[in-house]
Every structure is written in C-alpha cells, then in structure tokens.
C-alpha cells in the first residue's frame, strides 16, 4: 500500500483536509499540514476509525477480468456476475454508514416526492397522501462524484427474484390505465396541441372557427400521433439495451426455461419504461456490466389538472400562454376562444369582448386608439361618432362634445384651449362649426361672432377681417380708460367717440347683409391670416393690438399703408449652414473641440462627463474621444494630415541615386557582459590603453573610434557592459552594421550576453562572436559555442552562419583574424552611402566641457558634415565651430561612417538624437523653437491629461510614498542610465521619482530644489563646489556622489527600505493550560494555569484556544506566581493569568503566548 498525502486522501473521502486532520488527531496521529504523507499503517488506522472499507486493487482487477470473460456466457451467468460486481466494483474507499438507506431505483425520483413502498400501487387519486418512510440518504451520499451505491437490502434482491414473473403479468394489463401512460399521453397531447395551436394562431380572424371545426379531426390525429410518438420513445429508450436484447434473442433456442424468464422481464421493463428517465451508473472499469436504472417522472393526475405552460387538457383547464380550450377558458395572449373570452391584444371576439389596440367589435366595446364602433364607442383621435361617445384625444362627438383642434361638431360645442364659460363658448383654432359658432382665440362675446381661420360653413357665416357686416357692440368708455395707459388717454377717447358712431352703422348693415353667401368669406380670409402670421402671440394678446385692430380705423389704414413698405424692407435671411463634418488633429483641447462643433464648452464638458471623463476647458481629448462626442451631434470627423516643417526641410527620401553611392566603412559595435573584455579587446585593436581611465574598470559611456585594417577603415563603438546602460546599448545597435559579441571563454553566456544578442537581433545586424580569454587555463570555447546555440547563434563549423573567432585581448592573439572577419561581413553587406547628400547622423554621446562648452560625439551616417554647417539635433541648434577626429586631430569634413567630436551647439543634445545639417540658420532656429515649445506643451499635457485610468490610478496611489531624486552627471547617457536604474526600484509602496536630471556640476539651485521637494541629490562623476556643500549641509539635504553605478543603486535601495512600513512575523513563545478558575470582584476572571511548553512573558500577546478554535486574541493583563507579579514563567511552572477585556476563561482552555518581531527588508 502506497503512502498518501492528506489533501489527496481528503479528495477521495469527499471531505476537507482540515476535517481529516482532526480525525487523525483523534487517533493520536499528528501531521504538519495538508501536504504531509501518511504511512500505510496510519492509513489503515484512519480507515478503521472512520469506518471505511478499502478494497485490494489487484484483486479487483483480476475479478473484473474474470467478469468480462464470463459476460459472454448465458443470461443466468450474467446475472450472477452482476451481483458479484455490484458488491466489488468500486476501487474508491466507501464510507459505511449505520443509517438505513432505502433505495428503489425503479420508483426513485430525484426530488424524493414520489418514493413509494415496494410492490404497492400508487394511489394517485389521493390528494394528500403521505410516504410510509422517511428517506434519509440518497444513492450517491458520501461517494465521489460519478459513483452510485448499488448495494441494496437483501429483501430487495429476494423480491426481485420472486416477483419478476408477476411484474411482467401485472405490467401488461395495466398498460392502458396506469398513470404513467396517462402522463405520457398528456405529454404527447400537449405537444401536439401546442403545434396545432401555432397554426390556429396564424389564422388571425378565423381562429375560433378553425378550432371548432377541427375538433373532431384533431382527436383522431392526436390518437395517431400518440401511437407514433409511443413507438419512437420506446425505440429511443430501448437503445442502451438493444445489444443485450439482440444477443438474448439469438441464444433463445439454446437457453433453458429459466433463462427466458429474465428476458421477458427485460422486455416488459422496456415496454413499461415509457415516460421514465434512464440513469446509467458510471463504471469505467467494467463497461460491459453497466446498468440502466429507469426512473419515473412526477405523476400528473387526470382529475382537475392544473394547467401549465403549453399544457392543454380537456377538463376544466386553467388557460395559459398559447392555450386554446373549448370549455370555460381564461383568455390569454393571442388566445382565441368562443365562450366568454377575455379579450387581449389583437383579440377579435363576438361575445362581450373587452376591446384592445386595433380592436373592432360590435357589442358594447370600449373604444381605444383608432377604434371605430357603432354602439356606444369611445371616440379617438380624428374619430367621429354619433351616439354618446366618451371623448379622448382629438375626439369629435355630436352630443355635448368638447371642441378640440380641427374638431368639427354641430351641437353646443365647448371650447378647450383658453376656454371660458360653457354658456358663452369660444371657437378654437381652425375650428369650424355651423351652430352658434364663436370667434377664435382672443374671442369676445358670443352675440358678436368673429370669423375664424380657415372657417368655411354655409350656415350663419361669420364676418372676416374688415368685413362690414360685423356686429360690434358699443364700447364702454370707463373700461377703456382703466385698461389703457394714462399717456394715451386723450387719443383713445377720440377713437372711442368715432367708434360709437360707426357701431350704429355697422349694426344696421349687419342686419341687411346677414344672408350673404360663403364666397365672400373665402375671399376675405387671406388678410387675417397674414395679420396673425406677422404678429407674435404676446403682441396679438396685447390691448393695443385689440384696440388698433377692432376699434381704430385709422390704425387699420396706416397698417394697410405700411404693407407696401414692409414688402420692400423684408430682408432675405439665408438658412443656417448645417455642420456635417469637421477636420481635427490627433489631440485637441475641449475648447478647440467646442469651437469646431460650434457648441459651447459647457455642452462638450457635459457630454464628456456622461462618458465618465472629467475634463476642464484646457484638458486635451484624443481623436477617438472627439469622434464619439461629434457623433452625438451628428457630425463626422476627419483626422488632419499634419505636414511638419521638418518633413519639408529634411531630405529623408529613401530612394538614392545608385551612380552617386560610394562604399563606406562598416560601423561595428562591441557588446557583451560585464568584465568579459570588451574594452580590452577594443584597446588591443586600437593598440591604445583606454581602459585605465574607466572607473572601476567599467566603461561608463560610449566611445567611437576608427581603425585601419588592410588599408580599410573600420569604425568601432564601445557600449557599456552594465545592464543599466540598456538604452545606450540599444541606441548603439541601431546605428551599427556589425556587432562583435564578446563572450569570456571561462564564464560562458551571461545575462547581459543574452540581452546583447536580443538587441543585435532586433537591430538586424550581423553578429560576429569573439570568444575572449582563451589564454586562461579554465577556458572552454566549445562550451561557449554550445551555449550560444541555445539562443539561435550557431557556429559555421557546426552548420550555422555565425562567425566565431577565439581571441585573447590580453596577449593580442587572433586580433587580425577578427578584423578580417569584420571586413568579410562588411563586403557581404555591400555597405554604401551618398557623400553628396544632406548630412545626417546620430549623436553618440554629449557632455558639457568646462572649457569648450557643449561637446557632442556624432556619427555621420549619410552625406558629408563640414565645419560651418548649421545642425539641428532634437531641440538643440548650433553652428559647427570645430570638428575633432577620434585621434584628436582637427578636421574640416567628415564623410559617412566617420565619428567626430563637434563644438558649437547651444545646449547639450540628447544622446541618441538624430542630427541634420541645414543650410539656413533662420530656418534651423525656427524649427528648434517650435520643437522646444512642443516639448514644454507635452510636459504640461502629460500632467493635465485626464482619462478614467489615470483618475483611478491617482485614487489608488493615495498611500504611495515618493522618493524624489535629483541626478547630475558628467554626460547625458549617464543621467539616463542612473534614472532608469533607480526607477526600476519602484514598487507598490515606494515610487522613485526623478524630479530633475541634467549634465553638469551640482549647483546651489539644485540644493534649493532638493530642499523644497524633499529630494536626494545623486552626483555621478561630478563634484560640488565648497559653497554647494555648505548650502546642502545648512539645508539638511542628502547629497551623494558616486563614480560607479552599483553603489548608487545599493544606497537608494537602502533609503527605500527605510521608508517601507516594517513587516512583522509571529513568534510563538509557549502554551498555557487553564486548570482552575477564580472570579475576583473588581478584577474579573483569573485563570490558574500550567505552562505546558515554552515560556510566557508578561507583555506577550495571547490567543485563547478552546477545543481547537480561537475564541479571543488579546494581551495579558497580569502574570503572577503566587502573589508576586513576574516578568515571565517558564515551562513546568504554574501561574495565574488574566487577559485584558476578556473574562470568559474556562477550565481546559489553552492560551497560546506569542510576540510580533519586526522583519528586516
């Protein structure tokens, strides 16, 4: 028996590791954790303790093989084998429980609702029956997933054997009356009726007729479908046992009578199993003896059924969705019935329906929208009815209607909008009536009707604007005086006097001309229309307008006179241009976006806030966000194509004139791990000792040199070996053609060697491997070749394409061979350049020289650089005053692949910047100013740009501590290297932030900045003046000076560790067992305890453990021996303890004492 781990055993036993460990503890087996191994005897003890029987695996395998071999024999043998296999077909441990489990798979239901006693007929007619037993376990209780317990009581086995014959006889006659078959029939009927119902539902208006007419044919079809589905389900259910039945039918003549009996039972089970689900026991080891357990579905009774979804029955059903029945149905959605239906959506019925949307009925309908009926309809929009309608929106009726918009009625209309009393109704806008009509909006008395807008009726026409048959009553002078302003009293009295005389004449004319035809009304309609359209609502409602329009004839004449002038004075106002598309840059401010969209900034900010972007007027949004906002206003966006001045000025066309191309020297970079001899190799090539000047023997910044080999020039770049100079090395690889990878023969491939390989491959340069230090006794060049093969560099002699040269830089061995390989690789690359084009190259290194000012080492890549040329490198500009070669000689011109040192730049350029020679100083200065402005703008935008991600990040960084650093170095490359190395040290708790980095000595302004921002100053290869040191001391600014980067990183890491919150670990001191309890008034509960192991200190923290569960954590309030307070009590001694704020100490409790110790980080 093999050892087993706790967690694996827990999985097998379907329990948790913790529970298992508790059980092991009960039998005195102690384990450390869930990964501990249990010995075989411990396993046996555990199984015995928890009541698990473990079977022998080998024995099971042998018996299973025998079972498989015997399974091809007769049916009697098969049954015997099955009984044996039932008992011993599980390899997994099984928990034996004392609770009685009654399992009868043939009558077992998943919910347990239909578990009946054996061999008893279920009384399905009984409504509130009770089970004769309580089912306490299921067939899968306590087993692994996929296993089913097949062991059944012996009584069940005997009953199976004795009653198998009787069951066959009972099953056949009950086939037609059993509730199982009723369930099946009802299910099939449900499905068929559901299908029939769909077709009926499609016949919208004739649904009820189709249902009635087809009732007889449906019953015949349903019986046929029942039979057909019965056969199909029988076939599908019998599929798992079809193989067994076919074998039995072939062996029938050779079997005894005893063998036929179980076969018949199988057939009867198949017949009886319609409507039952089959459960196949998962047995992977013995597939030939898989058993099928038919399982009944819940029985549905046939008396007073409760309707279910898509369930159709014929006796008093409760209607459901899509349910059609003929006896007292309750109508549902799309339900069409003929007896007392309740109408629904699109429901058309003839007997007392309740009308719905688009519902047309003839018997007492309740009208809805667009509903037209003839008997008591409820009027709708534009609906005209004649019998007691109940008015709705825009409803027109003939009996006491309320007039609405475009409403035409003939009997006592009541005005709505601006409505006055019902005995003096007003007409409405566009309201035409023929009985007692009144004027419109702004209407006067009913005995003086006004003509209406667009009103054309033949009965009692109403006069129009300026019509002489108007019956205008005599105005009341006192009312007019109160109504009008005092400034116009005199004029209005005069108007009233004139109007009084005219009113008499108008009354007389109205009586004479009352029966005029309607043609005059039509002709007189237009002037009023013009007046109304030209006046605003407030002007029409004003008293001045009423007076001038209806009382003052002079005003009318003036108005008529002015009409000609109005026609002349009206100016044509062109319609506003609709904004359909805008062109915007890659990013723009909210203000610019608002101006582009012709919207206010507030509207744009609201839209952005709706998308979760909190922005102000000057915040930038990108093109995608601006596009989304523009689409909100239906405006399309196009990205502006920005052609920069640099693109116009600089000649970056890749197409070159082949006739002007000339061969150029190869640019070779030396790469490799720290101390593998890169600078020594370059020194051997140059035959000059440059390594002595490097601090600590480590190259700190790039040097560029030209050497002659076989009368041909080769330019070498020496990149630093330390990983902190990754960016510088990457820049070096970008400008080179060939990379010499230096690998020490004794060390082999190191981390930075791999990094150098990746950079060289990324730059797509040819790699030549120089295996250095072959003069050492421990050198193993073959090992180096093998290691390089893992990274895709295979030596030529091994079938690859990589050139590998073993060299010794110290003893100058094979140096010439290495140079020859470099020239060979250069010839294969066919390196050429045009020396007559505009000069272009890369800044290799730049520094600030005290005597000469900004000095830049540049590598010309194309064209010829001459003294006096104007240069642009990034945001710096200068005119070349002098050029020096790598040997220190002053030169006038430098062609392609030649490194030179130039003077005359206004600032120190960034290392790795591309430089261009320009012809005009003005253009160059303009470009530099533009670039500087862009840099400042980008720095400002970087802090103010708002996105959701930034917002959440800032919230999360509320507890982040910043370590501010100011870096000053001798060259720009070192500033970048130190900055990147230190920022890599940032973690979740401390963030390293370089607030300033520059080339040059440390100044007093740097100290001031450090004091204000609480920063550390790091100087790299620079020294501060005496005044700066004094200022730093007075300001208490930490200033550190380094010449090697390793020490700078170590010191900063130490500073960060000091800022980190300390971490603590728990150290257990000892355990105390409470043996007696004393309750002291005023003090609380004191426990008389015994120190079982370790020791207990007075200031230690304690944990009260009761029966393995921690119930309290706190501190000791007191620790005493007899009556004396003591600092600590050792193992084997008794003591009295009390715990702060805890008095629930009981006998048998274990108190665990511990202290928290700080962990160094």
Swiss-Prot record:
Q: Enumerate the residue ranges of region (G5).
A: 808-810
Principal place of residence: cytoplasm
Q: Which GO terms describe its molecular function?
A: GTP binding; GTPase activity; translation initiation factor activity
Q: Where is the composition biased (Polar residues)?
A: 213-224, 239-259, 276-287, 305-432
Region annotated G1 sits at 672-679
Q: Which residues form the tr-type G domain?
A: 663-832
User: What task does this protein carry out?
Assistant: One of the essential components for the initiation of protein synthesis. Protects formylmethionyl-tRNA from spontaneous hydrolysis and promotes its binding to the 30S ribosomal subunits. Also involved in the hydrolysis of GTP during the formation of the 70S ribosomal complex.
Q: Which NCBIfam families match?
A: IF-2, small_GTP
The protein in question is named Translation initiation factor IF-2
Gene it is expressed from = infB
